[in-house]
C-alpha cells in the first residue's frame, strides 16, 4: 500500500511515521508513506497556500491551485483508490472503514487547515471525506495520522501476531475483553481463575462474555 499525505505541516507527521508499527511496515516494504509539503506546489516565491475567502467570511482558505498541482502530479504517476479529505463534515471514521481502506493499493490524504479548502477541490477531486470525531483540531494532520495508523496496522504482515489485531476492540463491533499478565496475584488482586486454567474453550467463552458485558455497559450503541 502507498499513502500520500498532503499537508502544510510536514514536520508534524514525519516523526510519527518513523516510529513503532508505521516504521516497521515501511521497513518490511508492506506500506509506503510519502509526505508532501503543499507549499512546494505554490505559484509565488512566498509559497503562499492560503487566501482570504470571497464574501467577507472570517478566516483563511486553502487555495485551489497548489492543491490541484499536487494531486494532479500524483495522479499522473499512478491511479488512486481514494482521495481523502480530513474534515469535520466527513463520515465518522470507524473500524469497518479502516478495514475497507486497508484493501486499497494507493490512497491520498489531504489534510485540512485554516478555515478549510476552496470548495471546488471537494467537488472535483475528493472522493471521500473523513472525520475522526465531533471536535475541532488545528489541522487535519492528526486525523491523517490516525487514519493511516488504523489502516496500515491491519494489513497482513504488519503485526507479527495477526490474531492480536483481529481481536482488538471494534473488529466485531465489540469492545475487547480485559487482559492481564504476571503476577497472577498482586496486593490481593487476582487474575480470573479461568485465564489460568489452560482450558481453551472456557477461556474463549469468558472472553466473549466479557466483551459483550463491557460493550453493553460502556458502548451500548455498538450493539444496535
Curated annotation (Swiss-Prot):
Main location: cytoplasm
Catalysed reaction, written as an equation: guanosine(37) in tRNA + S-adenosyl-L-methionine = N(1)-methylguanosine(37) in tRNA + S-adenosyl-L-homocysteine + H(+)
Gene: trmD
Keywords: Cytoplasm, Methyltransferase, S-adenosyl-L-methionine, Transferase, tRNA processing
Quaternary assembly: Homodimer.
EC number: 2.1.1.228
Binding site for S-adenosyl-L-methionine: 112, 132-137
Molecular-function annotations in GO: tRNA (guanine(37)-N1)-methyltransferase activity
Name recorded for this polypeptide: tRNA (guanine-N(1)-)-methyltransferase
Disulphide-bridged cysteine pairs: none
Keyword Transmembrane: no
Family assignment from sequence similarity: Belongs to the RNA methyltransferase TrmD family.
Biological role: Specifically methylates guanosine-37 in various tRNAs.
Cross-referenced Pfam families: tRNA_m1G_MT (PF01746)
GO biological process: tRNA N1-guanine methylation
Species the sequence originates in: Phocaeicola vulgatus (strain ATCC 8482 / DSM 1447 / JCM 5826 / CCUG 4940 / NBRC 14291 / NCTC 11154)
Subcellular location field: Cytoplasm
Cross-referenced InterPro entries: Alpha/beta_knot_MTases (IPR029028), tRNA_m1G_MeTrfase_C_sf (IPR023148), tRNA_m1G_MeTrfase_TrmD (IPR002649), tRNA_m1G_MTases_N (IPR029026), tRNA_MeTrfase_TRMD/TRM10 (IPR016009)
PANTHER family according to UniProt: TRNA (GUANINE-N(1)-)-METHYLTRANSFERASE (PTHR46417:SF1)
Highest taxon, organism lineage: Bacteria
One cellular component term from this protein's GO annotations in UniProt: cytosol
